[in-house]
């Protein structure tokens, strides 16, 4: 196999990669020594990935020496455990070292197996690589792309156009797709829900700080759902719906957006509506949770077991049957006529 830098992984390193992919290790530190990729540190998992993150990674980062770190998450995809690939390139390292490690990154990912790598993190200072830095990276990834100068000018024009008092009948521009950051505790709760260690997560918007925060993770049955819906505030709910359908036992993730009508302020209604799509984008495309059904309600009383079942498994509408042509009155049909085809008529005449 040829590479840009000629750096390759030895057979020992490839064997270690295989053991790591099978879940034996939480962390591998990789360095380039004598023009070969080598494993210079490894750690086995002892607790959750969040609890071990900073204590395992940060002590391995040297001030003047680049390295790679493969860090294993607790989540899995179709190929196995998911990993974070970290490229550490400190500001004070030699330029030649920086270039060498930058040019070898693609090789490392390919040798390890790109399908196992969920996220890539690059850092020049430890704050970039810390757990807090990782969450900042995820928040940035889920935020909208920066606006061009023309788009920013257009945005300012629209803001000025809509800076008017909003009355009952006033038409106004609504906010579109606001991606508020998700706090750490909320993100962790969603991961636990995906792994089915929780069956209910409720999130709310901290309007003052403009963040999405955790509100509740109480273990919840279907019959308890109406009690979880506030009557005076909006919420986002994620529920692991365990049920049977056509003889199969199913686990389905359901998203419920509750908005109790006009008991909420205009700003609250606008923010919850605008943050919903970016939040679901993070859930479905970052956490890879498949949402079976998205429901909007204004009253928790709607969430009966039958309602939830029919939302997740909507009834198929039967095709309309054509009305049969009505028969004529009995005894008044007249003489039955026999209509012959052309061939039959000729035979009869012969």
From Swiss-Prot:
Q: Does the keyword Cytoplasm apply?
A: yes
Fetch the InterPro entries from UniProt.
Answer: ADF-H (IPR002108), ADF-H/Gelsolin-like_dom_sf (IPR029006), Twinfilin (IPR028458)
Keywords for the protein's UniProt record, in alphabetical order = Actin-binding, Cytoplasm, Cytoskeleton, Repeat
Localization (cell): Cytoplasm, Cytoskeleton
Q: Which residues form the ADF-H domain?
A: 4-139, 177-313
- Region Disordered: list its residue ranges: 316-350
Q: Which GO terms describe its cellular component?
A: cytoplasm; cytoskeleton
Family (UniProt): Belongs to the actin-binding proteins ADF family. Twinfilin subfamily.
Q: What is this protein called?
A: Twinfilin-1
- Species of the source: Xenopus tropicalis (Western clawed frog)
Instruction: Identify the taxonomic lineage of the organism of origin.
Output: Eukaryota, Metazoa, Chordata, Craniata, Vertebrata
